[in-house]
Amino acid sequence: MNLLLTNASIVTVETNDTGYLIKHNHFINIINGKIAQIGGMASCPLASSGKQLDCEHKLLTPGFIDCHTHLVFAGNRANEFEQRLTGVPYQEIARQGGGIMTTVNATRKATEAQLLEKALQHLSGLIKDGVTTVEIKSGYGLDLESELKILRVAKQIEQQANIKVSTTLLAAHAVPLEFKDNPDRYIDYVCNTIIPAAVKAQLVDYVDIFCEGIGFNLKQTERVFKSALSFGLGIKGHTEQLSNSGGSALAAKMGASSVDHLEYLDETGVKALADNGTVATLLPGAFYFLRETQLPPVELLRTYKVPIALATDFNPGTSPIASLLMIMNMGCTLFGLTPEEALRGVTCHAAKALGLAQQRGQIKVGFEADLCLWNIQHPAQLAYEIGTNLLISRIINGVLCND
């Protein structure tokens, strides 16, 4: 829990557009898992207790945060990948009973042990890319016991892996077959049964919903959000991925921490995000994997100074990409972000998307000592190089991890 880092080039990462702010030849003194002191080496204290690590002037950043994943599931959807490549759209696959429902069926049948083993395999890719905090959604159960099963596995991941986990209930991911003729009854079930049970079991931090033509409408979305808020939970939304439904504006006005995807977000929606402090989480992996062409309104987000986060959206159907460094590159090459914006997108802005902006995502005194040491000369290399093992070490709560 106590660790003295010396001879570091610190990339503090600020929430404002201030540049990289690299502090060369600095130390960080970590006490009880928190950053207690930062300064130049000339004023470096002696290591009175705990370990000492010479960073050898390598770059030190905040630990990365993947703020949108569907990490816990069974099976795969490689066959649908083949279908899409022959021209069958994702929406059509979903309407035919494929898509999310394919994964739901497999996940319902799987044991917690099976789900945990598979999730830890997926997580290993994120850990190699410097992820120290990960959000994990449910949404592949769509019934009470299966949704809780997924959330329990997410909690077990935090206990078994060196990582902080934020859990999100996404029971309103799709309408299960048993409710296919009455989606409103399913929303009743989500609001009156699943959300209260998840709260009682202390398994959930946020509630999410897929607000889209093939998902849930605005009225249903509002009902789910109201239920979540009544239990003191945070809210977030899958919005404006395939069409402009107004879900982002609704979520923002109701206090959402983030809205995610956003390819079809318009200026009205962007303004709502800005007015309510909601983070725009972009998911270039899904955009790439689905071969979409509608770009999210990055320039409008910049104009209105909306914080932009980036995440893998790791899932079996639309983004089986367990690399946050790859996502940073995609954010730059596909969406036109700068490498600096991409770095903020997986640190301070991702922390804000999870309600952790005062704890993680920056290198500041009083913050959790979640850090990454990289074998690079400049921060832009993080978004530039693909497939290179850039990470030297992760530090979580002041503990040096040997991943």
From Swiss-Prot:
Keyword annotations: Cytoplasm, Histidine metabolism, Hydrolase, Iron, Metal-binding, Zinc
List of residues binding Zn(2+): H68, H70, H238, D313
Cofactor(s) needed for function: Zn(2+); Fe(3+)
Residues that coordinate or bind 4-imidazolone-5-propanoate: R77, Y140, H173, Q241, T318
Cellular-component GO terms for this entry: cytoplasm
Any one Pfam family match given in the protein's UniProt record, by short name: Amidohydro_1
Gene3D superfamilies (alphabetical): Metal-dependent hydrolases, Urease, subunit C, domain 1
Residues bound to N-formimidoyl-L-glutamate: Y140, N315, G317
EC primary class: hydrolase
Cofactor, how bound (note): Binds 1 zinc or iron ion per subunit.
Its EC number(s): 3.5.2.7
Localization per record: Cytoplasm
Pathway: Amino-acid degradation; L-histidine degradation into L-glutamate; N-formimidoyl-L-glutamate from L-histidine: step 3/3
GO MF annotation terms: imidazolonepropionase activity; iron ion binding; zinc ion binding
Gene Ontology terms: biological process: L-histidine catabolic process to glutamate and formamide; L-histidine catabolic process to glutamate and formate
Catalytic function, reaction form: 4-imidazolone-5-propanoate + H2O = N-formimidoyl-L-glutamate
Alphabetized InterPro entries for the sequence: Amidohydro-rel, HutI, Metal-dep_hydrolase_composite, Metal_Hydrolase
Binding residue positions for Fe(3+): H68, H70, H238, D313
Function: Catalyzes the hydrolytic cleavage of the carbon-nitrogen bond in imidazolone-5-propanoate to yield N-formimidoyl-L-glutamate. It is the third step in the universal histidine degradation pathway.
UniProt family annotation: Belongs to the metallo-dependent hydrolases superfamily. HutI family.
Protein name: Imidazolonepropionase
Organism of derivation: Psychromonas ingrahamii (strain DSM 17664 / CCUG 51855 / 37)
Native organism taxonomy: Bacteria, Pseudomonadati, Pseudomonadota, Gammaproteobacteria, Alteromonadales
Gene: hutI
